[in-house]
């Protein structure tokens, strides 16, 4: 497992932010974390990256105990924060040089890694451009490039597409998929955009009021999202997989006709991610 969390607690004054949280994330997966404002997403990611201390609980990252192996964990993980984390008066290349040096990279190794990070995020043509002139999409891509400098086995991305145009969002999502597929990097992805989570992630969890209240694979969610229920005149009910082939659907309705039954109601599937999210976290607005 990439990450194993058991019984994590975090309090701020009298408020419980993470409440006996348990979570396991598979190595090599793209894991999506959803939650309303104030659910504890950023706090959880901050704890896993040693920005905020936990109050209680056990955390193992790539087999390392987080209380005993901070150096080892930091060397194999990286956080791409929601805010821009680079110097606007420096060029893209100069920023990567600076942050690469902080990781202890020097000489040819450093410059080879910079070229790789620029290529992975398609920033080669902007390498010598001052980043203060970058669009929102370019800034987000540079954030990711910096996050790749230490060749992380786990990459945390906290709302990495906030405030950018749809084309840039789409490009960044494909960059993230490519990082996962080519490097085998475990991705932990937080977002308010459910369509991003559905597109990217192998596993999806919902964090609400400090607890994991939902955790499933995308495959399982999709399987349940394709089942329609047919209520018949004899009070029975049949389920039909809307993703199955045409013959299976024809056979279902043929069998209904052969039994001289009538369809009283067809209930289409409602188990898409948005409906699951709203049903669990409720529909009231949150501050």
Question: Which stretches of residues belong to each language-model region?
Answer:
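Catalytic Walker B motif of ABC-type/P-loop ATPase nucleotide-binding domains
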Residues: 155-159
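Short, charged/small-residue-rich alpha-helical element at the C-terminal edge
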Residues: 218-287
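Conserved ABC ATPase "signature" region
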Residues: 97, 101, 108-126
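Conserved ABC transporter NBD signature motif
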Residues: 57-68, 72-73
């Amino acid at each position: 497992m990439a990450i194993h969390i058991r019984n994590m607690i975090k309090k701020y004054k009298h408020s419980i932010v993470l409440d006996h949280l348990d979570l396991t994330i598979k190595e090599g997966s793209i894991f999506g974390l959803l939650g309303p404002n104030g659910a504890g997403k950023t706090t959880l990611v901050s704890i896993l990256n040693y920005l905020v201390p936990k109050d209680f609980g056990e955390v193992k990252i790539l087999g390392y105990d987080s209380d005993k192996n901070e150096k080892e964990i930091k060397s194999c993980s990286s956080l791409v924060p929601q805010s821009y984390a680079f110097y606007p008066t420096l060029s893209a290349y100069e920023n990567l040089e600076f942050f690469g040096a902080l990781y202890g990279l020097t000489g040819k190794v450093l410059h080879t890694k910079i070229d790789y990070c620029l290529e992975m995020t398609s920033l080669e043509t902007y390498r010598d451009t001052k980043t203060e002139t970058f669009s929102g999409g370019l800034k987000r891509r540079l954030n990711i490039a910096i996050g790749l400098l230490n060749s992380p086995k786990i990459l945390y991305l906290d709302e990495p597409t906030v405030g950018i145009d749809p084309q840039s969002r789409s490009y960044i999502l494909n960059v993230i998929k490519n990082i996962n597929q080519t490097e085998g990097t475990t991705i932990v992805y937080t977002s308010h955009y459910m369509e991003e989570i559905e597109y990217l992630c192998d596993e999806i969890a919902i964090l609400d009021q400090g607890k994991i209240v939902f955790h499933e694979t995308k495959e399982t969610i999709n399987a349940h999202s394709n089942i329609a229920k047919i209520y018949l005149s004899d009070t029975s009910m049949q389920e039909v997989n809307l993703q199955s082939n045409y013959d299976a659907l024809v056979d279902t309705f043929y069998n209904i006709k052969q039994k001289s039954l009538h369809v009283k109601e067809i209930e289409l599937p409602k188990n898409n991610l948005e409906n699951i999210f709203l049903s669990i976290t409720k529909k009231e607005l949150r501050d």
